A protein has these predicted regions:
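N-terminal regions that are enriched for targeting/export leaders
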Residues: 1-5
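Active-site nucleophilic cysteine motif
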Residues: 10-24, 81-88, 303
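Structural recognition of the beta-strand scaffold that forms the well-ordered cores
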Residues: 17, 43-46, 90-92, 101-104, ...
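Sec-exported extracytoplasmic/periplasmic mature domains
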Residues: 20-29, 95, 99, 249
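Solvent-exposed loop/turn segments at secondary-structure junctions
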Residues: 22-23, 49-52, 101, 110, ...
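Phosphate-handling active-site elements
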Residues: 27-41, 317
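Papain-like cysteine protease catalytic cores
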Residues: 41-174
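Active-site signature of cysteine proteases
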Residues: 140-384
Length: 384
């Protein structure tokens, strides 16, 4: 799949957002014959952080009757806010708030260096969470708790404006050679893309620690309180490869995530289990398989990238794959990473594909009632 330009998430955990937007920009570039362009990651990130703050505060209200050492309450206070995420965040935010070109809301120091901002907002959210629990324990009615939460979100909004800038409500833009028009973020998205990100895409997982050909849902794994939890079909790796190859052959990029730190040769941009011989060096073996690594929290989905190419042998079987990364053009192989099929088997976890590339038998699995997994499941890991 052809691409134009490499993006750079800088010192932030926004790979999930860059990846989702890179998938969408490739569609827009192809559709309108555009040169290199980007959507504003900062615009989407602003509302992502605001919605996550609301998700946390409402979660605190919902669990206010439980003790502080309840596992869900503990999990909430350990995860008030992060800059990481998944494809659910891409769909949750864009479906509600739309998109803008990067020129309409550029990056800031804090959007490119999210650590301090996220820590400060997270600290404030924990303080607010305690206040909401105290109010609920004192018998404050739900309608009054909602008012308190809304006021708290006003504080978060101000913190986000100070660090990321205020989101644009309207802007003027045109295609090259076209007449400039005024858009809202939602009207811009609907006119130029308009994809139903919630219903037109299928989230696929390769998790050998769970039963295959089942639908799973991870609780609280979403970016909006009224959004959709990460709900996926768990498939054998060969099934996922067939879907990915069909998409690439049709020049359609995919959201893809993996455990990128394993056996990465960053200078060559190569992911291969044979890159390093740790067993000879240490005089021992490392025998856990993929299932065991998942069960022991030794491996999981840590980074999202855009799956864009595959090298097939004469029999049509994959030999290696290529992804567009978001670490800048100087990283890896001209901003890309290449992975052997052997590495793909061991460290690939998630692919998000358009429904038209997914067999009917897999789509039928989505009709099952999902098996609900807790928020602290090994497969709930923000991609950063």
């Amino acid at each position: 799949v052809l691409s134009k330009g490499i993006t750079d998430q800088q010192s932030s955990g926004r790979c999930w957002l860059f990846t989702g937007l890179n998938v969408l920009r490739s569609q827009m570039i192809a559709k309108y014959g555009l040169d290199e362009m980007e959507f504003s990651q900062n615009y989407c990130f602003f509302y992502d952080q605001l919605e996550k703050a609301n998700l946390f505060l409402q979660g605190i209200i919902d669990t206010s009757g439980k003790p502080m050492d309840d596992k869900m309450v503990e999990w909430l206070f350990k995860h008030p806010l992060s800059d990481g995420g998944q494809f659910t965040g891409v769909s949750d935010i864009i479906e509600k708030y739309g998109l803008v070109p990067k020129s309409a809301m550029v990056e800031t120091f804090s959007s490119e260096n999210t650590g301090k901002m996220s820590n400060l907002i997270g600290l404030k959210l924990k303080e607010f969470g305690l206040q909401l629990r105290e109010a609920a324990a004192a018998g404050v009615k739900p309608v009054e708790l909602e008012k308190k939460k809304t006021k708290m979100l006003g504080t978060v909004y101000r913190m986000l404006v100070l660090t990321l800038g205020e989101p644009v409500s309207t802007f003027t833009w045109s295609l090259k050679g076209g007449e400039a028009k005024e858009y809202t973020p939602v009207s811009f998205y609907k006119e130029f893309l308009g994809n139903d990100l919630t219903n037109n895409y299928v989230m696929l997982m390769n998790d050998p620690s769970r039963e295959f050909y089942k639908c799973y849902e991870i609780d609280f794994d979403r970016h909006r309180y009224d959004g959709k939890n990460w709900t996926y079909v768990n498939l054998p790796i060969e099934d996922i490869k067939e879907i990915a190859i069909a998409s690439i052959k049709d020049s359609t990029m995919m959201y893809f995530s993996c455990d990128v730190g394993k056996f990465l040769d960053s200078k060559r941009g190569l992911l291969d289990p044979d890159n390093y011989d740790y067993e000879s060096l240490m005089g021992t073996t490392f025998g856990m398989d993929k299932k065991q690594r998942i069960q022991t929290f030794s491996s999981g989905s840590s980074h999202a990238m855009t799956l864009m190419a595959v090298d097939l042998d004469k029999a049509g079987k994959p030999k290696k794959w290529m992804v567009e990364n978001s670490w800048g053009s100087a990283s890896g192989y001209r901003g890309h990473l290449i992975m052997t099929d052997k590495w793909f088997d061991e460290y690939m976890f998630r692919v998000v594909a358009e429904k038209k590339y997914v067999p009917a038998k897999v789509l039928d699995i989505l009709k099952q009632k999902p098996i609900r997994l807790p928020a602290w499941d090994p497969m709930f890991a923000d991609e950063e």
